Amino acid sequence: MNNDINSSVESLNSACNMQSDTDTAPLLEDGQHASNQGAASSSRGQPQASPRQKMQRSQPVHILRRLQEEDQQLRTASLPAIPNPFPELTGAAPGSPPSVAPSSLPPPPSQPPAKHCGRCEKWIPGENTRGNGKRKIWRWQFPPGFQLSKLTRPGLWTKTTARFSKKQPKNQCPTDTVNPVARMPTSQMEKLRLRKDVKVFSEDGTSKVVEILTDMTARDLCQLLVYKSHCVDDNSWTLVEHHPQLGLERCLEDHEIVVQVESTMPSESKFLFRKNYAKYEFFKNPVNFFPDQMVNWCQQSNGGQAQLLQNFLNTSSCPEIQGFLQVKEVGRKSWKKLYVCLRRSGLYYSTKGTSKEPRHLQLLADLEESSIFYLIAGKKQYNAPNEHGMCIKPNKAKTEMKELRLLCAEDEQIRTCWMTAFRLLKYGMLLYQNYRIPQRKGLPPPFNAPMRSVSENSLVAMDFSGQIGRVIDNPAEAQSAALEEGHAWRKRSTRMNILSSQSPLHPSTLNAVIHRTQHWFHGRISREESHRIIKQQGLVDGLFLLRDSQSNPKAFVLTLCHHQKIKNFQILPCEDDGQTFFTLDDGNTKFSDLIQLVDFYQLNKGVLPCKLKHHCIRVAL
């Protein structure tokens, strides 16, 4: 019995040893087993051990090679015959896919052949690997510009890669993770880097997110917003940098880069889209801006308007701006009246009266790395003497209160002069170029002007008010006649619409509410709110808006700016022959609705100090 058991154990051990020697044989690079003859001969030379000495632990069976062979056979049988693009490299290897005769292949593309660069170590998770978890695979090196099409791409490599990526997507090595952005062409990647989303708010609180280029200027962004909002581009739209916590705001210059300005703004700050008619008013009327006592050059010589403008833009002969300002002391709530001098090098204050000697001047703020802002509510937030405050703020995101230089002028005209002087001394000729760009665009080209047709050249203005028609030679009279004809056409069309419609509104009722569709009518706002809107959109002559009267429910108020001062005129209703009219001069001139009143005073001065030129507008983005 014991002999039978020993004989069966010996036969089992011999079979296990033969199987382990076969499975654990090392693989060569070509996938063949190493020769075991040396091991067999050495084992024959040694004396055989007893059955108990031959008893060994069971060795793990490496199934990687077997799985590779099965997978290779399965894929070869399941896939159609794919032409091998490199028969000279893989044709002699065992287990290679079936090759196709060269005559059956399509003509090769005109590209240089690929080169084989040998083995490389690649991380493939989730596989039975040896040692450090790396597996030796073959890699092909293609020349620059070579692309793998569906015809030349090896099908087995594509399927294997897809199987690995679907099997273990979470444990994939970071070195093998492919970023989809990295596969994009260089031009598309540059476009992604050069674009940024910017959020812009309007006066009514609405906002719009606009994708812009990183080098887009404030002028270009304003033109883009005008196009998207369907507004009239009259070169008066601006982008406003608004800081609600600090109570500061300023209009960006047309040449400033929007992304660069946004990088210096804190998170709570924002951009506003607003009109500013006074942005380049200085270049139109420079003498009206600076009184003689404020400009040092005016005290030394008697120059005209052109000479004053030239001296402001000239870097060598730039005048000094001087005068008294209220300056907030650093670290205190008190304000102190100081004699201040603004030069191209910076803003200085005198420690001894009005002396401008170098030993008496102290630097208050630098112009290069700073910007000047309007104080929105300086009297409430900073205890300023009045509401004509300014602030010089460094151009950085995190600004402490001790770095702000708070100033306050006596009135609005003095504040406008200081703000304009700061911009002129900082930007100089660049500011004048921004002013000239829209004017150059508006001029017709010298040689490419479109030719008018014969029928257009033969048209003339005619007056048919009398019994005999006459030709209007005066251009001003022709324009006035065209406006009158437009008003008459509007009245006729309104009357026809009322007669043809089933609306129960009486014509007088329609005339009483038709003005609410106009941009210059702002509804029920207070006097302070109307003044604030006028100041925000520029204190220029002729800037106006209409609103409901707070004292008389049936009346309206015309708010008008003249000589940088805001005035209010009441529009009262009056009745004549049972019909309601509106008048601004106690019934001397009557209008059936407010639209006719505004149209009339845009052409005629009348009892107003100036004509109506610009209206305040709020646009919803």
Curated annotation (Swiss-Prot):
Listed GO biological process terms: ERK1 and ERK2 cascade; gene expression; insulin-like growth factor receptor signaling pathway; negative regulation of D-glucose import; negative regulation of glycogen biosynthetic process; negative regulation of insulin receptor signaling pathway; negative regulation of Wnt signaling pathway; positive regulation of cold-induced thermogenesis
InterPro entries xref list: BPS-dom (IPR015042), GRB/APBB1IP (IPR039664), Grb10_SH2 (IPR035037), PH-like_dom_sf (IPR011993), PH_APBB1IP (IPR039665), PH_domain (IPR001849), RA_dom (IPR000159), SH2 (IPR000980)
Pfam families: BPS, PH, RA_2, SH2
Keywords assigned: Cytoplasm, Phosphoprotein, SH2 domain
Gene: Grb10
Post-translational modification: Phosphorylated on serine residues upon EGF, FGF and PDGF stimulation.
One of the record's GO cellular component terms: protein-containing complex
Location of Phosphoserine modifications: S50, S96, S455, S458, S503
Other facts: The GRB10 locus is imprinted. The maternal allele is expressed in most tissues, except the brain where it is expressed from the paternal allele. Expression from the maternal allele in fetal and adult brain was however described in PubMed:10861285.
Biological source species: Mus musculus
Polar residues: bias regions: 1-23, 33-59
Record protein name field: Growth factor receptor-bound protein 10
SMART domains cross-referenced by the UniProt entry: PH, RA, SH2
Boundaries of every PH domain copy: 318-427
Subcellular location(s) per record: Cytoplasm
Ribonucleoprotein recorded as keyword: no
Family statement: Belongs to the GRB7/10/14 family.
Domain SH2: 520-601
Regulation: Phosphorylation by mTORC1 stabilizes and activates GRB10 constituting a feedback pathway by which mTORC1 inhibits INSR-dependent signaling.
Record-linked PANTHER family: GROWTH FACTOR RECEPTOR-BOUND PROTEIN, GROWTH FACTOR RECEPTOR-BOUND PROTEIN 10
Subunit structure: Interacts with ligand-activated tyrosine kinase receptors, including FGFR1, INSR, IGF1R, MET and PDGFRB in a phosphotyrosine-dependent manner through the SH2 domain. Poorly binds to the EGFR. Directly interacts with MAP3K14/NIK and is recruited to the EGFR-ERBB2 complex. Interacts with GIGYF1/PERQ1 and GIGYF2/TNRC15. When unphosphorylated, interacts with AKT1 and when phosphorylated with YWHAE/14-3-3 epsilon. Interacts with NEDD4. Interacts with LRP6, thus interfering with the binding of AXIN1 to LRP6. Binds to activated NRAS.
Domain annotation Ras-associating: ranges: 194-278
GO molecular function: insulin receptor binding; phosphotyrosine residue binding; protein-macromolecule adaptor activity; signaling receptor complex adaptor activity
Pro residues compositional bias, start-end: 95-112
Function statement: Adapter protein which modulates coupling of a number of cell surface receptor kinases with specific signaling pathways. Binds to, and suppress signals from, activated receptors tyrosine kinases, including the insulin (INSR) and insulin-like growth factor (IGF1R) receptors. The inhibitory effect can be achieved by 2 mechanisms: interference with the signaling pathway and increased receptor degradation. Delays and reduces AKT1 phosphorylation in response to insulin stimulation.
Domain characteristics, as noted in the entry: The PH domain binds relatively non-specifically to several phosphoinositides, including PI(5)P, PI(4,5)P2, PI(3,4)P2 and PI(3,4,5)P3, with modest affinities.
